[in-house]
Curated annotation (Swiss-Prot):
<dbReference type="Pfam" id="PF02645">
    <property type="entry name" value="DegV"/>
</dbReference>
<protein>
    <recommendedName>
        <fullName>DegV domain-containing protein DR_0500</fullName>
    </recommendedName>
</protein>
<feature type="domain" description="DegV">
    <location>
        <begin position="7"/>
        <end position="280"/>
    </location>
</feature>
<comment type="function">
    <text>May bind long-chain fatty acids, such as palmitate, and may play a role in lipid transport or fatty acid metabolism.</text>
</comment>
<feature type="binding site">
    <location>
        <position position="93"/>
    </location>
    <ligand>
        <name>hexadecanoate</name>
    </ligand>
</feature>
<dbReference type="GO" id="GO:0008289">
    <property type="term" value="F:lipid binding"/>
</dbReference>
<keyword id="KW-0446">Lipid-binding</keyword>
<feature type="binding site">
    <location>
        <position position="62"/>
    </location>
    <ligand>
        <name>hexadecanoate</name>
    </ligand>
</feature>
<dbReference type="InterPro" id="IPR003797">
    <property type="entry name" value="DegV"/>
</dbReference>
<dbReference type="InterPro" id="IPR043168">
    <property type="entry name" value="DegV_C"/>
</dbReference>
<dbReference type="InterPro" id="IPR050270">
    <property type="entry name" value="DegV_domain_contain"/>
</dbReference>
Length: 287
């Protein structure tokens, strides 16, 4: 007999959801803007963004969910149900602050949890929270599981060009020019303590960047360690296939899935990117 859910989970647009995880929850969307026009991410597709990047001279910007958008996400939860709001890292966005403002206005019992990460790694935590809710576990147990998932999950990515990081002000003009001249591809990870991007290495080619990402996963967990792997791709799904093939040659893969990078995150990494969220073996509740 399945327990009644003990609370409901909501999240924000930092999430890259996987169909084989419990990621189908109300979302407070980020927005993408080209010049004066702003579009909530739930109203545009990845392909639309890639088309705009190719034809629109304006560089897009992204913006966090507003308190009203968080209120709308809370309102999607049936009245009387407590809410666990899982946010993108506060080191990367002010979404958590907007969620807190909305909580003060909602008249609901809302608990905030800073994932200290984003994207596929955020999806792992949302899944953990939903498993706890569906099993009738307490919110404290859900948070403990999310903290365990956060501690053991590594999120890394590489990109084909530094141009979009440069345009967005996340890398200097000189660094971008030098990287382009030498064809250097960064390997970026999310620091667990600060929840911010840190440089984890570089490669001389995009294919080399993919190999660098998967090699760092193996160095982290040790060859032969069973892994759960969430893969991310931009315009080329085959990049995810290549990364999985490399990891599967060195690890038993106990779960894997792939999904496209959402439009808002694509603003910063550009059309072609590869990301990997990896964690060892079983989920916390399976041990």
């Amino acid at each position: 007999m399945t327990a009644m859910p003990s609370f409901a989970v909501v999240t924000d647009g930092g999430l890259d959801a996987y169909p084989t995880l419990l990621n189908d929850v109300p979302v407070a969307p980020f927005s993408v803007a080209f010049g004066e026009r702003s579009y909530p991410m739930n109203e545009v597709s990845r392909q639309w963004l890639y088309d705009e990047l190719g034809r629109n001279p304006a560089h897009p910007t992204s913006s966090q969910p507003s308190p009203q958008q968080w209120l709308d996400a809370y309102a999607a939860v049936p009245s009387g149900t407590d809410i666990l709001a899982v946010t993108i890292s506060s080191g990367l966005s002010g979404s958590r602050n907007a969620a807190a403002q909305a909580r003060d206005l909602a008249g609901r019992q809302v608990t905030l949890h800073d994932s200290m990460t984003l994207s596929a790694a955020q999806a792992f935590q949302v899944h953990a929270a939903n498993v706890a809710a569906q099993r009738g576990e307490s919110m404290e147990t859900a948070i403990a599981w999310m903290n365990a998932v956060q501690a053991e999950t590594e999120l890394q990515f590489t990109i084909e060009t530094l141009e979009y990081l440069r345009r967005g002000g996340r890398i200097g003009t000189v660094a971008a020019a030098l990287g382009g001249l030498l064809n250097l591809k960064p390997v970026v990870m999310v620091d667990k303590k600060t929840g911010t991007y840190v440089n984890a290495g570089r490669a001389r080619s995009y294919r080399g960047g993919i190999e660098a990402v998967t090699s760092q996963v193996t160095r982290k967990y040790g060859e032969g360690t069973p892994l759960r792997v969430g893969l991310l791709y931009g315009t080329h799904p085959e990049d995810a296939d290549q990364a999985l093939e490399q990891l599967a040659a060195r690890h038993p893969i106990v779960w894997s899935d792939r999904t496209g990078v959402n439009p808002v995150l694509s603003v910063h990494v550009g059309p072609r990117a590869l990301g990997v969220a990896a964690a060892p073996g079983a989920w916390p509740w399976e041990r």
